From Swiss-Prot:
Pfam families: Motile_Sperm. Endoplasmic reticulum (ER)-anchored protein that mediates the formation of contact sites between the ER and endosomes via interaction with FFAT motif-containing proteins such as STARD3 or WDR44. Interacts with STARD3 in a FFAT motif phosphorylation dependent manner. Via interaction with WDR44 participates in neosynthesized protein export. Participates in the endoplasmic reticulum unfolded protein response (UPR) by inducing ERN1/IRE1 activity. Involved in cellular calcium homeostasis regulation. The modification Phosphoserine is found at S146, S156, S159, S206. The lineage of its organism: Eukaryota, Metazoa, Chordata, Craniata, Vertebrata. It comes from Mus musculus (Mouse). The keyword Transit peptide does not apply. This is Vesicle-associated membrane protein-associated protein B.
Length: 243
């Protein structure tokens, strides 16, 4: 016996499209229309009932009326190979006089009275998720570039400060060199003047003259030593900055 042709109109007719990402519930609508002059019973079936929630999944459509069915795809990890397993079927039949117990109505229905339409599922990914590998590469490359450019940027920001510090240290070094040279000259002159005064004031073999000359020389030597140590420290600082 030939199968009865579906009397309900379906929109869409052949495909249910679900647009991702599929990390949350994705809903699409199926419109069922009854162009006949009789009431029609319907129910919606799927090959993967755990993945979908259909509201309403069954009922009666009055003559000349239509009904929107919400098909809700539950969140899942998208697998392109799995979409061929997701299919829906809209089954219908003309409603009997008594439709108070729809479960009994479907159980008692004869196969030749049943009409059905099949729809396949289509999963669409947004453009930015179409090529996840490319997206990951795009995310990685700018991050790597920013890490590479960061030291250069830091260097360009800090280099003027380093140059200024070096100039200051060099100026201080030159000043200290001049100070050391001046003290050396002063020390030499004092030695000559003290020697002349001591020789004029007392005999050269006098212990007092020897102690006076020694005290002044030690004072100058201490100042010179302090300046030399400071000059050495400045030199070490310059060496570290240059490195």
């Amino acid at each position: 016996m030939a199968k009865v042709e579906q009397v309900l109109s379906l929109e869409p007719q052949h495909e249910l499209k679900f647009r991702g990402p599929f990390t949350d519930v994705v809903t699409t609508n199926l419109k069922l229309g009854n162009p006949t002059d009789r009431n029609v019973c319907f129910k919606v079936k799927t090959t993967v009932p755990r993945r979908y929630c259909v509201r309403p999944n069954s009922g009666v459509i009055d003559a000349g009326a239509s009904l929107n069915v919400s098909v809700m795809l539950q969140p899942f990890d998208y697998d392109p190979n799995e979409k061929s397993k997701h299919k829906f079927m809209v089954q219908s039949m003309f409603a009997p006089p008594d439709t108070s117990d729809m479960e009994a109505v479907w159980k008692e229905a004869k196969p030749e009275d049943l009409m059905d339409s099949k729809l396949r599922c289509v999963f669409e990914l947004p453009a930015e998720n179409a090529k996840p590998h490319d997206v990951e590469i795009n995310k990685i490359i700018p991050t790597s570039a920013s890490k590479t450019e960061a030291p250069a940027a830091a260097k360009s920001l800090t280099s003027p400060l380093d140059d200024t510090e070096v100039k200051k240290v060099m100026e201080e070094c030159r000043r200290l060199q001049g100070e050391v040279q001046r003290l050396r000259e002063e020390s030499r002159q004092l030695k000559e003047e003290d020697g002349l005064r001591v020789r004029k004031a007392m005999p050269s073999n006098s212990p007092v003259a020897a102690l006076a000359a020694t005290g002044k020389e030690e004072g100058l030597s201490a100042r010179l030593l302090a300046l030399v140590v400071l000059f050495f420290i400045v030199g070490v600082i310059i060496g570290k900055i240059a490195l």
